[in-house]
Amino acid sequence: MADVRYYGTGRRKHSVARVHLVAGDGKVVVNGRDISEYFGHETLIMMAKSPLVLTETEGKYDVIVNVNGGGYTGQAGAIRHGVSRALLQADPEFRPSLKEKGFLTRDARMKERKKYGLKAARRAPQFSKR
């Protein structure tokens, strides 16, 4: 019998995470490396694992993630979104708690574009009175 896999796609900023949940002992593998090796900061690891902690499924599933694009914060957010969606496939009863914490909502905030005549999105060149 084939092992049951639950799949979820997560996005944040420019990052896209493809997440697979497989019944296991709680290993989290990101791009072929352990999560603590991939993300140096404990806050990013906690962010990525937060849906598992919330639903108390941390030791029940192995999480296999393929993530690309963006920086580490965006990738951690994308993983959180993807894990939440995959958990929803595994058990639809997780929806209220995940929705309450906002883990199912795609964070639509993106980097604001640079405008011509300005140095950055909103930063204007230095003003000189005379």
UniProtKB/Swiss-Prot annotation:
Is Transmembrane there in the keyword field? no
Pfam families recorded for this chain? Ribosomal_S9
Q: Which UniProt keywords apply?
A: Ribonucleoprotein, Ribosomal protein
Q: By its UniProt entry, which Gene3D superfamilies does this protein fall under?
A: 3.30.230.10
| A Gene Ontology cellular-component term | cytosolic small ribosomal subunit
Gene Ontology BP, a term = translation
Single GO molecular function: structural constituent of ribosome
**Similarity comment:** Belongs to the universal ribosomal protein uS9 family.
In Swiss-Prot or TrEMBL terms, this protein is called Small ribosomal subunit protein uS9
Q: Which organism is it from?
A: Exiguobacterium sp. (strain ATCC BAA-1283 / AT1b)
Q: Which gene encodes it?
A: rpsI
